[in-house]
Amino acid sequence: MGATWRSPGWVRLALCLAGLVLSLYALHVKAARARDRDYRALCDVGTAISCSRVFSSRWGRGFGLVEHVLGKDSILNQSNSIFGCIFYTLQLLLGCLQGRWASVLLRLSCLVSLAGSVYLAWILFFVLYDFCIVCITTYAINVGLTVLSFREVQGPQGKVKGH
């Protein structure tokens, strides 16, 4: 049976919009920093709390991996924020669809985002020795979306929906 439309729910809508806004803000900060090396973003609180330094690092593009695997000029070697915008839009759209494949894609994309969040958090703390407020907030949003996606599969007493 095909997928049908439904409301994504207020929590998913709020999380996706917050993630999208933060991803767009990260793109803005990265672009402003590229134009002006002295640019100071609102999220740049100090030397060890600097989102613009994180966004401008080699790990702020293609997760620090794409350039080494596919080359610097690969179309996939984009700012991580671009992937964030795509992810949060996809989460919102898939959250509006009712159907088995939409549910599977929703949960699978959440798990991928969770793995990416753990990887980037490790880079943030143990390689860059930084604290990025925007980054940490997006990781929390990704955890929230993952929890929400798996909760939607179960009914009120923990029973799987539709069974």
Swiss-Prot record:
Regulation: Inhibited by warfarin (coumadin). Warfarin locks VKORC1 in both redox states into the closed conformation.
Keyword presence, Transmembrane: yes
Subcellular location: Endoplasmic reticulum membrane
GO cellular component: endoplasmic reticulum membrane
Annotated residues for binding of phylloquinone: 135, 139
Gene3D superfamilies according to UniProt: VKOR domain
Stretches assigned to the Cytoplasmic side: 1-9, 96-100, 154-163
EC number: 1.17.4.4
Protein name: Vitamin K epoxide reductase complex subunit 1
Gene this protein is translated from: VKORC1
